[in-house]
Amino acid sequence: MRMLLTGKNGQVGFELQRALAPLGALRAVDHAECDLTDEQALRRLIREWRPSVIVNPAAYTAVDRAESEPEAAFAANGRAPEVIGEEAARLGALVVHYCTDYVFDGRKPEPYAETDAPSPLSVYGESKAAGTRALCLQAKKHLVFRTSWVFGAYGSNFAKTILRLAGEREELKVVADQVGAPTSAALLADVTAQILGQYQRWPNRDQFPYGLYNLAAAGETTWCEYARTVVAAAWRAGYNLRLRPEDVRPIAAAEYPLPAARPANSRLATDPLRRTFGLRLPPWREGLEHVLRQLHRTS
């Protein structure tokens, strides 16, 4: 396979470089090499490289800042995937794209399915929903992985923020009325590579099960319990912290207002992905323990 990877310096893109390398020729670019909001540069890159697979984890991910920068969010998250879809269709290429739980309002009591209609609460969620919709309309061959609460050893994320604060503070208040599944960037990359490996071996690619799939680690938690788990796992991994798990106090989201509203329910049903591709999705705590050990070794 001849692959093009965007956003190589993001937390998911970083892991994808590792996971995709064994599958074939890989060209990985960052924002400096190709600004996704520069439509002509993006088209030129795709036409020059002529990939058979385009993997696009690049996105505008500043959820709160998007409320005051909607044009920037929609350029990167809305229009860029549409352009990628148009160019992929010209080449007959497969596009792999990533979406978010923030396309939902969180009012559904059960985990969200792939068939549930988006109803975002934020500009970020609106931009991601628009980009996914446009991409799927343009590119027949697409795999969109909708995920939640992404973390990793590389880049900025909730787990690393809690780890830093645990070394600085003796008490922390964290939202306890929003539920989801923390999902490691490594899991996203590994599952992507496994499915692309199946795609590579698929006898008739016209019959490959393209589409949108929920992809998140097994289990669920609140942000507060997630933070407590980060602190407890960090102590076990050998970190010297000021904060103990019991020092993480629960609060309601209403007590910690942010510019962008978040869904109360971010749970995603993953049965179709696991059944279609024969995959096991490990518990979120496994990925967290691995990342914390990795960070401790390199600190």
Indicate where each model-derived feature is located:
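N-terminal Rossmann NAD(P)H-binding glycine-rich loop of SDR-like oxidoreductase domains
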Residues: 1-20
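Amphipathic terminal alpha-helices
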Residues: 282-299
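Catalytic helix-loop patch of NAD(P)-dependent Rossmann-fold dehydrogenases
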Residues: 68, 75, 79-83, 90, ...
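NAD(P)H-binding glycine-rich loop region in Rossmannoid oxidoreductase-like domains
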Residues: 39-78
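Mid/C-terminal beta-alpha module of Rossmann-like enzyme folds, strongest
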Residues: 191, 198-257
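Active-site loop of classical SDR/Rossmann-like NAD(P)-dependent oxidoreductases
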Residues: 249-269, 283
